[in-house]
């Protein structure tokens, strides 16, 4: 069988894409069905940012939305409270004979953490909105609606759901019979719906989103496919906490770093089959928020920092914070435009290269950031501001504080939360402060006791005339590092 990811002169690692991403949120936090319709309008405005086969099959699109209280009250025939229930959406295994096993796995994992399953259902779809060739490319989505254990709320509930998710993934990603079992999302705040779709097909395809009682206050979307992967519903976006436009050119380095961190903690990272760079970024973000207990904005900034080293406009506390982040976090460099959200915070960030477009508009009712301006017609509603996110910049809305934060405000707010200057000082090791140690004391008896000539040292360190002519001599002459 031919490996389609690398054949002849073709290598999928060099694939590029120009995705469409964005978010829309009601600043008052009120859930309405109209926000879904505005999201559909935004998605219909960017078909050129999605990929489509000659037969009209989209290469991937989806939405992440907050959980609709009104809708899930009807689905469960009960009165639910936000933060006291959750929703899990799953692609089932490719082999229909394994569906019951997969359902039992999910049910068992929920029960282990004390979750109470309220409803298990298949997400209804309208195949008539798709081209005939696209129907066979879609995967059915099974949905679990579950109640939180008594007394478990907030961050503790998020951790319990995360443990449930990890238990499911540990078997789903390592058992050949369960190939295809993939959790789109499992959360007490958000749910993800996606597939091999074109942007204009998302809302009409998922019938839940067309129900008038399906009311939400936040939506973020992605159209086109994850970089460096063959089109498949599981690697379509959004992922669980973010959507990413671009490609992460530091992905290999970031994976090595994550593996090293996991090994130091005596853990093991279990990755889904064919994981894209965007999916890996989302997996890391989940780890930072749930396992390392960082708030979402801090995690995003630490993973994708601005170019701060030579920026004299940043305050000392902000510089100390970013320096501290650099001690433990490998930077994720793109080009990358990132949309992130967890139900209470929704935001957008551009990496320090700044090579992906993000346009913003704020009205009295809404805040939106999208790949292109004018994707939504807000009618006669007064516009408070329009703009764009610059390299290393961000804009997010905090529904708990009922306000938005730009780049400067966000960095200053984060820097004020801890004494990063002291943390950097505590982490720094000064060579002058180290006690003197005799080299002879630690030299093995078999070590070379003589001395190399100067030319011998050149050979030992693989230095030749080319190294001196093009690297060392210019560095000595200019005092700058040769690129």
Predicted regions and their residues:
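Conserved short alpha-helical segments that host acidic/polar catalytic motifs at enzyme active sites
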Residues: 1-483
